[in-house]
């Protein structure tokens, strides 16, 4: 069962969160801003929050989950994905889910090995299986986010640390999906929904280059870099994110 929460009034908007997260952690600050203009459906991806895991995992099931929520809410529907949720959203649109407009924030790499190096998923899985979720999260933050000792100490003290640790249980499979992903514009010729590709202007150069390549490779997409932001824009500048998205959606 895929859980989702509904709030607001107006056109339908579906939100898809990324890894190490759930609907509340990812969108708690954003949802009230969007709900002034739209009916917002924030889902928990399978294995996260209140959603069940559903047995054997396959990436296509994530895309089917998003498509099922889209089909269950009043049309037309706009779809917003953050990080790994952006990849899920894009793949759902590619598979034929009915989307009026699509918003993606980072998370769609040209080559997923830049996000998830070879072997990382197996190392994370080994730590999780030996009941060391915090060590697994430290590994990812060190090798993917390049956090040094001082930043790791701040991470451990942060308000979202416990939620992130909880998300580690299914992180290895998400890293495996990213490791095998390559962006090929030919796969997305059928994604005709107008698309806004977002990235933080202060995100790593490789992340910005990924966003630029995706925007250039989709049939009807444009790129916007959010000033002063990195990957955590939803938490650090929800108003900026909301204003940018609402303008694109035309609400």
Regions found by a protein language model. Give the residues of each.
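Short beta-strand/loop motif that positions the catalytic acidic residue
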Residues: 191, 197-199
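Catalytic histidine-centered segment of alpha/beta-hydrolase-like enzymes
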Residues: 226-240
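Gly/Ala-rich beta-loop-alpha elbow adjacent to hydrolase catalytic centers
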Residues: 81, 85, 89
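Flexible "cap/lid" loop of the alpha/beta hydrolase fold
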Residues: 90-130
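Conserved HGGG/HGGXW glycine-rich cap/lid loop of the alpha/beta-hydrolase fold
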Residues: 1-52
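Conserved alpha/beta-hydrolase "acid-adjacent" motif
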Residues: 204-210
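Hydrophobic, aromatic-rich cap/lid helix
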Residues: 159-184
């Amino acid at each position: 069962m895929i859980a989702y929460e509904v709030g607001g009034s107006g056109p339908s908007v579906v939100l898809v969160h990324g890894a190490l997260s759930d609907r509340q952690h990812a969108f708690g600050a954003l949802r009230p801003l969007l709900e002034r203009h739209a009916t917002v459906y924030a889902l928990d991806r399978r294995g996260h929050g209140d959603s069940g895991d559903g047995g054997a995992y396959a990436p296509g099931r994530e895309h089917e989950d998003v498509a099922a929520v889209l089909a269950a809410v009043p049309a037309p529907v706009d779809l917003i994905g953050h990080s790994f949720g952006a990849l899920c959203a894009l793949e759902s649109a590619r598979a034929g889910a009915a989307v009026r407009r699509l918003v993606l924030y980072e998370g769609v790499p040209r080559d997923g090995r830049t996000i998830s190096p070879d072997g990382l998923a197996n190392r994370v899985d080994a730590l999780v299986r030996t009941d060391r979720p915090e060590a697994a999260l430290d590994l990812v933050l060190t090798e993917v986010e390049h956090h040094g000792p001082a930043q790791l100490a701040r991470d451990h003290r942060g308000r979202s640390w416990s939620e992130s640790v909880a998300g580690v249980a299914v992180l290895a499979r998400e890293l495996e999906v990213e490791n095998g992903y390559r962006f090929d514009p030919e796969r997305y010729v059928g994604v005709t929904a107008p698309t806004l590709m977002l990235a933080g202007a202060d995100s790593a150069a490789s992340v910005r280059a990924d966003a630029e390549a995706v925007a250039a490779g989709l049939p009807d997409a444009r790129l916007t870099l959010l000033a002063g932001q990195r990957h955590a824009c939803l938490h650090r500048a929800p108003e900026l994110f909301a204003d940018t998205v609402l303008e694109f959606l035309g609400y």
